[in-house]
Amino acid sequence: MLPLPRRQQQVLQATVQHYVDTVEPVGSRTLVRRFGLDASPATVRSAMGALEQKGLLTQPHTSAGRVPSPKGYRQFVDALLPEPGAAVVQLQRELAELSLQWAALDDLLHHLARRLADLTGLMSIITRPQRQEPRLKALRLVRSGDRLLVFLVESSAASSSLNLRLPPDSSAQLQALEHWLNDQLSKSAINWSGLPSHLQSVGAPLKQALASHNRGRNRQAEGALTTGLAGLLCQPEFQLTTSLRPLLQLVEQQPHELLNPAAATASGGVWIGQEHPHPALSGCAVVQAPYATASGGEGSVALVGPMRMAYATALAAVEAVAGTLSRLLA
C-alpha cells in the first residue's frame, strides 16, 4: 500500500489506539478531543471517510463511529507503530539482568511465559527448542562385563552415552564394528544397509538403541508451554462460545498450530486475522519471534490475542523474551 497522507496517518493511529483502549467505535469529535488532533472534527471526519474507502476503517453500524479493519491494523503495524511503553522498558531491564539460574529449562520457559502473559493480558506460547536429529561425528565402543558402553560425539560438540546388553561371544566384533561405524561417519552418516553380515549380531541392537535414543530426545523437546488463557478469555472478542470453541480446541490439542509455520525460518513477525493459515485464528492476531540455542535448537516465543491488540507492547515484549532466551541458551 502507498504511504498515507500525514492527516490520515494521525487519524488511523488515533482510531486504533482508541479502539484498543475502549473496544468502542469512535467518531471524529472524540478523536479531536482525546488525542488533541490539530484539525477540526469535519477535517477528521473527512480523513476517516477516506480511510474507510481504502478499507482501513469500517463502520459496524450506520449510526456508530468507526473501528479499524484487519487491513487497517496491518497498516498500523507496518508504518505507524509507536514506541513501547514503560512496562516493556521495565521488562527489558529485568531480562537484561536475568541469568540461567533455573535447574530445568521448562522452569525458565514457564517463568518467561507467565511474565509475558501478565504484562500483556494475552495468551503466551513458548515452544521448547527443536533441533534436527544430531549428526554423529564419532563414537567409541567399550565393553564392561556383559554390557556395551557407547560414547557418542555429535556435530554440536555435545556428547552422550548409551548402555546396552552385549550378545554372547561378541567381543571380537567390537573393534571391527567401531572401525566400520567411524568410517561411515567420516563420510556423512551411517548407512546401516551396508553393515557387514559378520557384524550384524552387535550392529543390529546398536542401531535400535541409537534410534530409540534419538526418538526419546525428540519427544522430550516436543511441546509448547502456554499460559494466560484466562486473560485471553476476558477479552470481549472471546465472550461468544461459538467463536471461542475452535480456539480452545486448538490450544488444548495442537498448541504448535497457534504459531505461524512461515516464521519457523524467518525473523518472526505479526499475523493479523486471516493472514494466519489456521481458520481458528481468523479473528485473532499472533505476534511471534524466534530464538536459537548453542546446540542448533530453534524455538518460538509468541502472544495470541484479539486483533484489537497493543501491538507495540506485544511485539517489543516478544522480541525481548526471544532475545533473552537466545542469550541464556547460547
Swiss-Prot record:
GO terms for molecular function: DNA binding. GO terms for biological process: negative regulation of DNA-templated transcription. It holds the Pfam family HrcA. It comes from the Bacteria. The keyword Transcription applies. Gene3D superfamilies: 3.30.450.40, Heat-inducible transcription repressor hrca homolog, domain 3, Winged helix-like DNA-binding domain superfamily/Winged helix DNA-binding domain. Keywords: Repressor, Stress response, Transcription, Transcription regulation. InterPro entries: GAF-like_dom_sf, HrcA, HrcA_C, WH-like_DNA-bd_sf, WH_DNA-bd_sf, WHTH_transcript_rep_HrcA_IDD. Belongs to the HrcA family. HAMAP family: HrcA (MF_00081). Negative regulator of class I heat shock genes (grpE-dnaK-dnaJ and groELS operons). Prevents heat-shock induction of these operons. This is Heat-inducible transcription repressor HrcA. The lineage of its organism: Bacteria, Bacillati, Cyanobacteriota, Cyanophyceae, Synechococcales.
